[in-house]
Protein backbone atom coordinates (compact mmCIF):
# COMPACT_ATOMS: atom_id res chain seq x y z
CA UNK A 1 0.00 0.00 0.00
CA UNK A 2 2.83 2.38 0.84
CA UNK A 3 4.44 1.71 -2.54
CA UNK A 4 1.24 2.67 -4.36
CA UNK A 5 0.89 5.93 -2.40
CA UNK A 6 4.52 6.72 -3.16
CA UNK A 7 3.86 6.09 -6.84
CA UNK A 8 0.91 8.46 -6.94
CA UNK A 9 2.40 11.37 -5.08
CA UNK A 10 6.06 11.42 -6.01
CA UNK A 11 6.63 9.25 -9.04
CA UNK A 12 3.69 10.59 -11.03
CA UNK A 13 4.54 14.22 -10.37
CA UNK A 14 8.23 13.77 -11.01
CA UNK A 15 7.67 11.92 -14.26
CA UNK A 16 5.27 14.56 -15.52
CA UNK A 17 7.72 17.32 -14.65
CA UNK A 18 10.60 15.44 -16.22
CA UNK A 19 8.78 14.81 -19.47
CA UNK A 20 7.67 18.45 -19.59
CA UNK A 21 11.30 19.48 -19.18
CA UNK A 22 12.27 17.46 -22.21
CA UNK A 23 13.90 14.52 -20.44
CA UNK A 24 13.79 11.01 -21.84
CA UNK A 25 11.41 8.52 -20.26
CA UNK A 26 14.30 6.88 -18.42
CA UNK A 27 15.61 10.19 -17.10
CA UNK A 28 12.12 11.26 -16.04
CA UNK A 29 11.51 8.29 -13.71
CA UNK A 30 13.19 8.94 -10.33
CA UNK A 31 15.92 6.51 -9.31
CA UNK A 32 13.91 5.50 -6.22
CA UNK A 33 11.13 4.25 -8.47
CA UNK A 34 13.64 2.22 -10.46
CA UNK A 35 14.96 0.40 -7.39
CA UNK A 36 12.26 -1.84 -5.98
CA UNK A 37 13.45 -4.28 -3.35
CA UNK A 38 14.08 -7.74 -4.87
CA UNK A 39 11.64 -10.38 -3.64
CA UNK A 40 10.24 -13.66 -4.83
CA UNK A 41 6.99 -13.33 -6.75
CA UNK A 42 5.19 -16.66 -6.63
CA UNK A 43 1.90 -15.22 -7.89
CA UNK A 44 2.83 -14.12 -11.43
CA UNK A 45 2.37 -16.93 -13.93
CA UNK A 46 2.29 -17.89 -17.59
CA UNK A 47 -1.11 -17.53 -19.26
CA UNK A 48 -2.81 -18.87 -22.35
CA UNK A 49 -5.26 -16.96 -24.51
CA UNK A 50 -7.12 -16.54 -27.79
CA UNK A 51 -3.99 -16.20 -29.96
CA UNK A 52 -3.40 -19.94 -30.00
CA UNK A 53 -6.34 -22.35 -29.85
CA UNK A 54 -6.19 -26.10 -30.37
CA UNK A 55 -8.83 -26.65 -33.02
CA UNK A 56 -8.07 -23.39 -34.81
CA UNK A 57 -9.46 -19.85 -34.71
CA UNK A 58 -13.06 -19.75 -33.55
CA UNK A 59 -12.87 -23.11 -31.78
CA UNK A 60 -14.21 -23.48 -28.25
CA UNK A 61 -11.44 -22.26 -25.96
CA UNK A 62 -12.74 -24.34 -23.06
CA UNK A 63 -13.05 -27.55 -25.07
CA UNK A 64 -11.08 -30.51 -23.74
CA UNK A 65 -8.53 -30.35 -26.58
CA UNK A 66 -7.60 -26.71 -25.98
CA UNK A 67 -7.51 -26.97 -22.21
CA UNK A 68 -5.26 -30.02 -22.45
CA UNK A 69 -3.01 -28.26 -24.98
CA UNK A 70 -2.48 -25.44 -22.49
CA UNK A 71 -2.05 -27.71 -19.49
CA UNK A 72 0.52 -29.86 -21.33
CA UNK A 73 2.68 -26.78 -21.66
CA UNK A 74 2.38 -25.64 -18.06
CA UNK A 75 -0.44 -23.14 -18.54
CA UNK A 76 -3.03 -23.09 -15.74
CA UNK A 77 -4.59 -19.64 -16.33
CA UNK A 78 -6.76 -18.80 -19.33
CA UNK A 79 -7.93 -15.60 -21.01
CA UNK A 80 -10.90 -16.50 -23.21
CA UNK A 81 -13.27 -14.81 -25.60
CA UNK A 82 -17.04 -15.20 -25.26
CA UNK A 83 -18.53 -16.34 -28.56
CA UNK A 84 -22.21 -16.34 -27.63
CA UNK A 85 -23.41 -12.74 -27.49
CA UNK A 86 -26.79 -11.14 -26.95
CA UNK A 87 -28.03 -7.69 -27.97
CA UNK A 88 -25.40 -4.93 -27.79
CA UNK A 89 -22.66 -7.43 -27.00
CA UNK A 90 -24.13 -8.84 -23.78
CA UNK A 91 -22.46 -12.06 -22.66
CA UNK A 92 -24.61 -15.12 -22.18
CA UNK A 93 -24.57 -16.07 -18.49
CA UNK A 94 -25.16 -19.75 -19.22
CA UNK A 95 -22.26 -19.74 -21.68
CA UNK A 96 -19.97 -18.23 -19.05
CA UNK A 97 -21.04 -20.88 -16.55
CA UNK A 98 -20.35 -23.61 -19.10
CA UNK A 99 -16.87 -22.19 -19.75
CA UNK A 100 -16.19 -21.92 -16.03
CA UNK A 101 -17.35 -25.50 -15.40
CA UNK A 102 -15.14 -26.82 -18.21
CA UNK A 103 -12.13 -25.00 -16.78
CA UNK A 104 -12.82 -26.21 -13.26
CA UNK A 105 -13.10 -29.83 -14.38
CA UNK A 106 -9.77 -29.62 -16.19
CA UNK A 107 -7.93 -27.79 -13.41
CA UNK A 108 -7.72 -24.54 -15.37
CA UNK A 109 -8.19 -21.09 -13.82
CA UNK A 110 -10.69 -19.03 -15.85
CA UNK A 111 -8.82 -15.84 -15.07
CA UNK A 112 -9.73 -13.27 -17.73
CA UNK A 113 -12.02 -12.45 -20.65
CA UNK A 114 -11.13 -10.42 -23.74
CA UNK A 115 -14.11 -8.26 -24.70
CA UNK A 116 -14.75 -6.78 -28.13
CA UNK A 117 -13.84 -3.24 -29.18
CA UNK A 118 -17.25 -2.22 -30.54
CA UNK A 119 -17.82 0.49 -27.92
CA UNK A 120 -14.92 2.65 -29.07
CA UNK A 121 -16.31 2.80 -32.61
CA UNK A 122 -19.46 4.59 -31.45
CA UNK A 123 -20.17 8.30 -31.17
CA UNK A 124 -22.31 9.63 -28.28
CA UNK A 125 -25.91 8.47 -28.52
CA UNK A 126 -28.40 5.79 -27.58
CA UNK A 127 -26.50 2.98 -29.29
CA UNK A 128 -23.38 3.74 -27.28
CA UNK A 129 -25.43 4.02 -24.09
CA UNK A 130 -26.84 0.54 -24.69
CA UNK A 131 -23.38 -0.82 -25.34
CA UNK A 132 -22.13 0.65 -22.05
CA UNK A 133 -25.03 -0.91 -20.17
CA UNK A 134 -24.17 -4.27 -21.71
CA UNK A 135 -20.52 -3.90 -20.66
CA UNK A 136 -21.57 -3.08 -17.10
CA UNK A 137 -23.74 -6.21 -17.10
CA UNK A 138 -20.84 -8.23 -18.49
CA UNK A 139 -18.63 -7.16 -15.61
CA UNK A 140 -21.22 -8.43 -13.15
CA UNK A 141 -21.47 -11.74 -15.04
CA UNK A 142 -17.69 -12.08 -15.12
CA UNK A 143 -17.56 -11.66 -11.36
CA UNK A 144 -20.16 -14.39 -10.89
CA UNK A 145 -17.85 -16.96 -12.50
CA UNK A 146 -14.72 -15.75 -10.71
CA UNK A 147 -13.10 -13.89 -13.59
CA UNK A 148 -10.67 -11.28 -12.26
CA UNK A 149 -9.70 -9.32 -15.39
CA UNK A 150 -11.49 -8.04 -18.49
CA UNK A 151 -9.12 -6.99 -21.27
CA UNK A 152 -9.87 -4.84 -24.29
CA UNK A 153 -8.05 -3.36 -27.28
CA UNK A 154 -9.51 -0.09 -28.55
CA UNK A 155 -9.18 -0.18 -32.34
CA UNK A 156 -10.98 2.54 -34.29
CA UNK A 157 -8.80 1.32 -37.15
CA UNK A 158 -7.58 -2.29 -37.45
CA UNK A 159 -4.18 -3.42 -36.20
CA UNK A 160 -1.77 -2.34 -38.91
CA UNK A 161 0.79 -4.61 -40.64
CA UNK A 162 1.89 -4.12 -44.23
CA UNK A 163 4.96 -6.30 -44.78
CA UNK A 164 6.49 -9.74 -44.23
CA UNK A 165 10.05 -10.76 -43.41
CA UNK A 166 11.79 -14.13 -43.45
CA UNK A 167 12.95 -15.48 -40.10
CA UNK A 168 14.82 -18.39 -38.59
CA UNK A 169 13.81 -21.90 -39.51
CA UNK A 170 11.69 -20.76 -42.42
CA UNK A 171 9.21 -18.73 -40.37
CA UNK A 172 7.57 -15.51 -41.46
CA UNK A 173 7.55 -12.35 -39.35
CA UNK A 174 4.71 -9.85 -39.61
CA UNK A 175 6.11 -6.35 -40.09
CA UNK A 176 5.18 -2.71 -40.52
CA UNK A 177 6.85 0.30 -42.09
CA UNK A 178 5.10 3.65 -42.18
CA UNK A 179 4.02 4.32 -45.74
CA UNK A 180 5.36 7.38 -47.51
CA UNK A 181 1.84 7.93 -48.84
CA UNK A 182 0.07 7.26 -45.55
CA UNK A 183 -2.04 10.41 -45.98
CA UNK A 184 -3.63 8.79 -49.03
CA UNK A 185 -4.81 5.68 -47.16
CA UNK A 186 -8.60 5.24 -46.86
CA UNK A 187 -10.34 6.35 -43.68
CA UNK A 188 -11.42 3.49 -41.40
CA UNK A 189 -15.00 2.31 -40.98
CA UNK A 190 -15.40 4.40 -37.81
CA UNK A 191 -14.82 7.56 -39.84
CA UNK A 192 -12.50 10.32 -38.74
CA UNK A 193 -11.86 10.20 -34.99
CA UNK A 194 -10.01 13.17 -33.53
CA UNK A 195 -7.91 12.99 -30.38
CA UNK A 196 -10.60 14.90 -28.47
CA UNK A 197 -13.28 12.49 -29.71
CA UNK A 198 -11.17 9.48 -28.78
CA UNK A 199 -10.46 10.73 -25.27
CA UNK A 200 -14.13 11.62 -24.76
CA UNK A 201 -15.06 8.02 -25.53
CA UNK A 202 -12.39 6.66 -23.20
CA UNK A 203 -13.33 9.07 -20.40
CA UNK A 204 -17.03 8.22 -20.66
CA UNK A 205 -16.19 4.52 -20.60
CA UNK A 206 -13.91 4.73 -17.57
CA UNK A 207 -16.26 6.90 -15.49
CA UNK A 208 -19.12 4.48 -16.17
CA UNK A 209 -17.26 1.19 -15.85
CA UNK A 210 -14.48 1.47 -13.25
CA UNK A 211 -16.82 2.05 -10.25
CA UNK A 212 -18.65 -1.13 -11.27
CA UNK A 213 -15.33 -2.96 -11.57
CA UNK A 214 -14.48 -1.91 -8.02
CA UNK A 215 -17.87 -3.07 -6.77
CA UNK A 216 -17.48 -6.51 -8.34
CA UNK A 217 -13.70 -6.88 -7.96
CA UNK A 218 -12.97 -7.17 -11.68
CA UNK A 219 -9.99 -5.30 -13.13
CA UNK A 220 -10.20 -3.57 -16.50
CA UNK A 221 -7.06 -3.93 -18.64
CA UNK A 222 -6.58 -1.72 -21.71
CA UNK A 223 -4.30 -2.91 -24.51
CA UNK A 224 -2.49 -0.06 -26.31
CA UNK A 225 -3.46 0.48 -29.93
CA UNK A 226 -1.12 -1.50 -32.18
CA UNK A 227 1.04 0.13 -33.45
CA UNK A 228 1.35 3.27 -31.31
CA UNK A 229 2.97 6.46 -32.48
CA UNK A 230 1.18 6.66 -35.81
CA UNK A 231 0.91 10.22 -37.14
CA UNK A 232 -2.39 11.91 -36.39
CA UNK A 233 -4.79 11.37 -39.25
CA UNK A 234 -3.52 7.91 -40.20
CA UNK A 235 -6.63 6.32 -41.76
CA UNK A 236 -8.59 9.14 -40.12
CA UNK A 237 -7.58 8.23 -36.55
CA UNK A 238 -5.78 10.16 -33.83
CA UNK A 239 -5.04 7.24 -31.52
CA UNK A 240 -4.80 7.58 -27.75
CA UNK A 241 -1.26 6.20 -27.66
CA UNK A 242 0.07 8.69 -30.22
CA UNK A 243 2.34 10.53 -30.51
CA UNK A 244 3.82 9.24 -27.20
CA UNK A 245 2.97 5.80 -25.86
CA UNK A 246 4.25 6.66 -22.36
CA UNK A 247 2.23 9.87 -22.19
CA UNK A 248 -0.80 7.93 -23.43
CA UNK A 249 -0.50 5.37 -20.64
CA UNK A 250 -0.22 8.08 -17.98
CA UNK A 251 -3.14 10.09 -19.32
CA UNK A 252 -5.33 6.99 -19.60
CA UNK A 253 -4.77 5.72 -16.07
CA UNK A 254 -5.07 9.21 -14.54
CA UNK A 255 -8.65 9.68 -15.82
CA UNK A 256 -9.86 7.34 -13.08
CA UNK A 257 -6.90 6.64 -10.82
CA UNK A 258 -7.94 3.27 -9.45
CA UNK A 259 -6.31 -0.14 -9.10
CA UNK A 260 -9.20 -1.38 -11.23
CA UNK A 261 -8.18 0.86 -14.16
CA UNK A 262 -5.02 -0.63 -15.61
CA UNK A 263 -3.45 -2.23 -18.63
CA UNK A 264 -2.92 -5.35 -20.61
CA UNK A 265 0.68 -4.24 -21.04
CA UNK A 266 1.73 -5.48 -24.46
CA UNK A 267 5.50 -5.18 -24.48
CA UNK A 268 5.70 -5.66 -28.23
CA UNK A 269 3.15 -2.96 -28.95
CA UNK A 270 4.80 -0.61 -26.47
CA UNK A 271 8.18 -1.19 -28.13
CA UNK A 272 6.68 -0.39 -31.53
CA UNK A 273 6.11 3.18 -30.32
CA UNK A 274 9.68 3.74 -29.12
CA UNK A 275 12.80 4.82 -30.98
CA UNK A 276 15.04 2.76 -28.70
CA UNK A 277 12.92 -0.04 -27.23
CA UNK A 278 15.78 -1.70 -25.34
CA UNK A 279 16.17 1.25 -22.97
CA UNK A 280 12.90 3.18 -23.28
CA UNK A 281 10.58 0.30 -22.38
CA UNK A 282 12.19 -0.20 -18.95
CA UNK A 283 10.92 3.00 -17.24
CA UNK A 284 7.45 2.41 -18.68
CA UNK A 285 7.26 -1.04 -17.09
CA UNK A 286 8.69 0.34 -13.85
CA UNK A 287 6.15 3.13 -13.73
CA UNK A 288 3.06 1.03 -14.46
CA UNK A 289 4.06 -2.08 -12.53
CA UNK A 290 5.19 -0.06 -9.52
CA UNK A 291 1.76 1.58 -9.38
CA UNK A 292 -0.07 -1.74 -9.58
CA UNK A 293 -1.56 -0.86 -12.98
CA UNK A 294 -0.44 -3.95 -14.92
CA UNK A 295 -3.18 -6.58 -14.97
CA UNK A 296 -1.76 -8.77 -17.74
CA UNK A 297 1.42 -8.90 -19.82
CA UNK A 298 1.74 -9.70 -23.52
CA UNK A 299 5.36 -10.82 -23.90
CA UNK A 300 6.22 -10.18 -27.55
CA UNK A 301 9.52 -8.96 -28.92
CA UNK A 302 10.27 -6.92 -32.02
CA UNK A 303 13.21 -5.93 -34.17
CA UNK A 304 13.24 -2.25 -34.99
CA UNK A 305 11.15 0.43 -33.35
CA UNK A 306 8.89 3.39 -34.06
CA UNK A 307 7.14 3.09 -37.45
CA UNK A 308 9.49 0.34 -38.71
CA UNK A 309 9.48 -3.06 -37.01
CA UNK A 310 9.02 -6.81 -37.34
CA UNK A 311 7.45 -9.18 -34.79
CA UNK A 312 9.97 -11.87 -33.80
CA UNK A 313 10.51 -14.63 -31.25
CA UNK A 314 10.88 -13.44 -27.65
CA UNK A 315 14.57 -14.38 -27.48
CA UNK A 316 15.79 -12.47 -30.56
CA UNK A 317 14.39 -8.93 -30.45
CA UNK A 318 15.35 -5.55 -29.05
CA UNK A 319 14.13 -6.06 -25.48
CA UNK A 320 15.84 -8.00 -22.70
CA UNK A 321 12.95 -9.82 -21.06
CA UNK A 322 15.09 -10.95 -18.13
CA UNK A 323 15.41 -7.29 -17.09
CA UNK A 324 11.68 -6.75 -17.49
CA UNK A 325 10.84 -9.91 -15.56
CA UNK A 326 12.92 -8.68 -12.63
CA UNK A 327 10.82 -5.52 -12.51
CA UNK A 328 7.61 -7.56 -12.52
CA UNK A 329 9.00 -9.87 -9.83
CA UNK A 330 9.61 -6.97 -7.47
CA UNK A 331 6.30 -5.19 -8.18
CA UNK A 332 2.72 -5.94 -7.04
CA UNK A 333 2.07 -7.76 -10.37
CA UNK A 334 0.29 -11.09 -9.80
CA UNK A 335 -1.44 -12.01 -13.05
CA UNK A 336 -0.73 -13.72 -16.39
CA UNK A 337 2.21 -13.27 -18.73
CA UNK A 338 1.11 -14.44 -22.19
CA UNK A 339 3.13 -15.06 -25.36
CA UNK A 340 1.85 -12.93 -28.21
CA UNK A 341 1.93 -12.67 -32.04
CA UNK A 342 4.40 -15.50 -32.57
CA UNK A 343 5.90 -16.04 -36.05
CA UNK A 344 4.12 -18.30 -38.55
CA UNK A 345 5.25 -21.37 -40.50
CA UNK A 346 3.52 -23.53 -43.10
CA UNK A 347 4.01 -26.62 -40.94
CA UNK A 348 2.55 -24.86 -37.90
CA UNK A 349 -0.52 -23.08 -39.32
CA UNK A 350 -2.20 -22.63 -35.94
CA UNK A 351 1.11 -21.58 -34.33
CA UNK A 352 0.65 -24.20 -31.62
CA UNK A 353 4.35 -25.06 -31.78
CA UNK A 354 5.35 -21.40 -31.67
CA UNK A 355 3.20 -20.68 -28.65
CA UNK A 356 4.43 -23.80 -26.88
CA UNK A 357 7.91 -22.30 -27.19
CA UNK A 358 6.56 -19.04 -25.79
CA UNK A 359 4.98 -20.73 -22.77
CA UNK A 360 8.20 -22.52 -21.91
CA UNK A 361 10.25 -19.36 -22.37
CA UNK A 362 8.04 -17.43 -19.95
CA UNK A 363 8.04 -20.22 -17.36
CA UNK A 364 11.83 -20.33 -17.53
CA UNK A 365 12.07 -16.56 -17.04
CA UNK A 366 9.79 -16.70 -14.00
CA UNK A 367 11.87 -19.51 -12.51
CA UNK A 368 15.12 -17.69 -13.28
CA UNK A 369 14.24 -14.39 -11.62
CA UNK A 370 12.75 -16.06 -8.56
CA UNK A 371 15.89 -18.18 -8.21
CA UNK A 372 17.93 -14.99 -7.85
CA UNK A 373 16.38 -14.01 -4.51
Where are these regions (language model features)?
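A generic structural signal for short
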Residues: 47-49, 54-55, 87-88, 126-127, ...
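Boundary/entry segment of secreted carbohydrate-active catalytic domains
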Residues: 34-62
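Short, acidic/polar
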Residues: 54-70, 132-139, 280-287
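Active-site-proximal loop/turn and secondary-structure-junction residues that shape catalytic pockets
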Residues: 50-54, 84, 116-119, 154-158, ...
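Structural motif corresponding to the early beta-alpha repeats
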Residues: 81-203, 207, 214-215, 269, ...
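Long, His/Glu/Asp-enriched segments that create or flank divalent metal/ion-associated functional microenvironments
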Residues: 78
Amino acid sequence: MERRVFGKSLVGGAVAAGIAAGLSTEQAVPQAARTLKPKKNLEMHVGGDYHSIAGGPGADMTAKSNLEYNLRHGVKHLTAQVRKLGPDGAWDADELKRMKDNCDKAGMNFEAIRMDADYIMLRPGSERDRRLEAIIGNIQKASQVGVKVVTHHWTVIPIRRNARQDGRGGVTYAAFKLEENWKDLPVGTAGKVSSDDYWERITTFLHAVIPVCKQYDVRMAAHPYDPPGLPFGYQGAENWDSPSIFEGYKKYEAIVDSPYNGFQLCLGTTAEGLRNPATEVIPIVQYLAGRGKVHQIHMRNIKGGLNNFAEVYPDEGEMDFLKIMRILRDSPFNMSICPDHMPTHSEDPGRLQAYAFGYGYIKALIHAVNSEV
